[in-house]
């Protein structure tokens, strides 16, 4: 009887120890699994979308969109948690330029060699910021204020950072990001190449559709009652543009003088559509439309996306496709 009690005790202890060991192993496995995930952090939506397409269904990669939907990239400043996220990343992708001056300070603080860092603008042919017809002047940091109507010089060496708006640059960005993923996760290189090629095919398809609209245009001028962060797009399709502000402006309310200028341009050239960009209410565009008989329409510049579009999984391709109908009406 005593022997049976001892054996029962031994069995119970063994069961308890087995459970503890299994729990420890499972805990370590989970911890290791989370730790082993490849962490990729990007600053802007276009790079996020391209990487999302390249990575595909790979659950071993954790992709973070630092800016997040619904926010203005020009006024963004990283939080303490954002800095930690970048520091813990295997790959950090940023655009640079005036829009992301904060990145310089962040990069200086990173541990050397811990995080692979790429400035995606290095992989495309950038252009200097251009003066836009109708655009009000805006101040760059450390520049003197210019009176309205005065010639304005952009900061020396400043480039237009809205590189993703042309299909040509979008393809270059996808190729560059795919190669970076190969570097940090070579075992999945074939999958990354395949996914990148599929996405590039989609970009080429939407490019072809937009080019067809441009080929059949009645006019070549787009009018923005807003800032105009689409110079690469405008140059790529050989269009003309008038806007209230250039692409780097943080202003949202144009002066009466600027509104009058745009209204006159619309009336003189019989412009059918007044454009405003995502995350804007379109109030100014609607005001000008009411005065001129034109129609106010939103165009997607992929500067960022709304929370709704983000949650619905909208992409560079789907948002550019949304622009096709807008362009048909604007260029008729």
Spans of features found by a protein language model:
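Extracytoplasmic metal-acquisition and chelation regions
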Residues: 2-332
């Amino acid at each position: 009887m005593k022997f049976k009690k001892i054996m029962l005790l031994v069995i119970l202890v063994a069961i308890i120890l087995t459970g503890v060991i299994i729990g420890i192993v499972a805990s370590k496995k989970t911890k290791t699994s989370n730790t082993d995930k490849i962490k990729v952090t990007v600053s802007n939506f276009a790079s996020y979308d391209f990487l999302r397409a390249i990575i595909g269904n790979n659950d071993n990669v954790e992709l973070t969109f630092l800016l997040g939907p619904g926010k203005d990239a020009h006024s963004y400043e990283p939080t303490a948690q954002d800095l930690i996220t970048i520091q813990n990343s295997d790959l950090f992708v940023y655009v640079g330029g005036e829009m992301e001056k904060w990145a310089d300070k962040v990069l200086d603080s990173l541990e050397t060699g811990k995080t692979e860092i790429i400035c995606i603008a290095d992989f495309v042919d950038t252009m200097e910021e251009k003066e836009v017809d109708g655009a009000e002047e805006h101040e760059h940091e450390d520049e003197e204020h210019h009176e309205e109507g005065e010639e304005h010089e952009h900061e020396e060496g400043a480039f237009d950072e809205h590189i993703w708006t042309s299909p040509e640059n979008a393809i270059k960005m996808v190729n560059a990001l795919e190669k970076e993923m190969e570097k940090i996760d070579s075992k999945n290189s074939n999958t990354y190449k395949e996914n990148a090629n599929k996405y590039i095919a989609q970009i080429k398809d939407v490019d072809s559709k937009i080019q067809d609209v441009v080929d059949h245009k009645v006019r070549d001028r787009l009018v923005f009652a807003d800032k105009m962060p689409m110079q690469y797009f405008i140059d790529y399709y050989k269009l003309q543009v008038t806007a209230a502000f250039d692409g780097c402006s943080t202003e949202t309310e144009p002066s009466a003088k600027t509104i009058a200028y745009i209204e006159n341009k619309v009336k003189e050239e019989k412009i059918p559509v007044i454009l405003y960009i995502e995350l804007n209410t379109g109030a100014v565009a609607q005001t000008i439309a009411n005065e001129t008989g034109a129609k106010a329409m939103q165009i997607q510049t992929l500067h960022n996306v709304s929370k709704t579009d983000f949650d619905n999984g909208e992409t560079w391709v789907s948002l550019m496709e949304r622009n096709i109908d807008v362009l048909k009406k604007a260029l008729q």
